Amino acid sequence: MSEGVSEQVKVGKVLTVDDVRKVAHPAYPYMLPAMEPYSEKDAYDMLSGAVDMHLHGSPTGWMPYRPSMLETSKEASLAGMKALCFKDHYYMTSPIARIIQESLETWAIEKGIKPTNVYGGVTLNYAVGGLNPHAVRTMLKGDFAEYSKVLWMPSIDSDLTRRSAGLGDGITILDKDGRLKQEVKEILEIVSSAEQHVAVESCHLYVEEIMKLAEEAEKHGVTLVVTHANQELTLLTVEEARQLIDMHAWIQLVAVSMLGTPIAAPGWMVNYYHTMELIKKLGPDKIILASDAGQTGAKPVEYYKLMIWSLLTRGVSKAAIRKMTVENPEAALKLRS
């Protein structure tokens, strides 16, 4: 860094040069304040009743050696977790959720425990036709409809993701005049009129797109969850998050964007302190915690536990964590208590 550069020069949406210098200090680990005295068991025990509404696994069309969805579901059951909702970038996960649930029921009886509830959904990438109302209707019918809980807007094929990665244009939910495309309105209408409650996640959209989506979702009475608002690609400022909360959206903060993924994305600079700031300034009432794990080397139940443990040791109360891991995702997904 050249001399005279302002400490407040941004190296990300909110991260400054000063922030980077602090965490790059050679004595950084030895200068941190003492942790609150919570053990790993304290964090693990808090998984009981928790919901992880955004996680990944195998089988998948992208990234080898992801954790098995079935094995993750077993680990969640052993921890007493209430529900999981698996996401894949390429295919509808609701049918797989049904198959996993049936297998899990038999296994849980043998173990003498209660199985976690397993759900899925669909992500509107090119593999399912993009912003495709037919894919949404398919998710909501048939003998796997009850396992559909989340509809994700485009992720790896979104305009934001593709342009950020230097891959050219991608899918946008806005037309050339900056208004929501008709097919997006149709999709929200399908969701709002369905017998099965489904939450919509913003996924990898520009903030401008999310704001327009939130306005329309509110009109239709559709539950909107703003996906990994602590990840640099889709990061929200405190002010943006407040604006979306005012439109009745939930703000999702995820473990991998707080803690990093050393195998799948070594060296990834994450927004740990911005995650803490969002929790502190917004409060827990409209925040949902999730793992977003399931990448190579990132087991979802383990990552969720580590996120909880980290928050406990940094002063976030058990009551606030329970709100963000149990009560809020239950409300967003309309799960029975």
Task: Enumerate the language-model features and the residues they cover.
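Active-site mouth loops of central-metabolism enzymes
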Residues: A50-S68, G120-G130, T172-G178
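Short acidic/histidine-rich active-site segments
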Residues: V254, P284-V301
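Extended substrate/RNA-proximal surfaces in nucleic-acid metabolism proteins
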Residues: N125-T227
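An N-terminally biased module of ancient metal coordination in phosphate/nucleic-acid-related enzymes
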Residues: S2-T116
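Mid-to-C-terminal alpha-helical segments outside catalytic/metal-binding sites
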Residues: E302-S337
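Divalent metal-dependent hydrolysis catalytic cores, especially in the metallo-beta-lactamase
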Residues: D52, E71-P95, K114-A127, S148-S158, ...
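Catalytic pocket-lining loop regions of alpha/beta-barrel enzymes
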Residues: S202-V270
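Histidine/acidic-residue-rich catalytic or RNA/ligand-binding cores of hydrolases
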Residues: G61-R66, S94-R98, I210-E216, L235-A241, ...
